[in-house]
């Protein structure tokens, strides 16, 4: 597997966040955890970019994957800047698949 830059934005007490972390650890996929309680400004920025406040979210080499709140946002890519795009996903499993297939 090639080396990827993976940041995982997490909230304490979030079951989906725990599932993502546990799965990434089990698959031995390296990532940088970004606890929102410790880095609120970073998480506020991610929420602003995606338009959602559901966690977890991941930044996979500049593409922010998040659980879409609206069905119409699933699979929709939005270019924020030259370095950042967003992609609405259906579930944690979809995010994990995207990471594994990257």
Label each region the model flagged:
Residues 34-54, 64:
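Thioredoxin-like thiol-disulfide oxidoreductase module
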């Amino acid at each position: 597997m090639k080396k990827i830059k993976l940041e995982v934005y997490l909230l304490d007490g979030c079951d989906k966040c725990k599932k993502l972390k546990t799965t990434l650890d089990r698959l031995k996929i390296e990532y940088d955890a970004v606890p929102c309680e410790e880095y609120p400004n970073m998480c506020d920025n991610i929420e602003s970019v995606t338009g959602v406040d559901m966690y977890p979210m991941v930044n996979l080499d500049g593409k922010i994957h998040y659980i879409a709140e609206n069905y119409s946002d699933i699979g929709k890519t939005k270019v924020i800047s030259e370095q950042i795009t967003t992609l609405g996903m259906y579930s944690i499993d979809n995010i994990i698949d995207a990471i594994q297939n990257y």
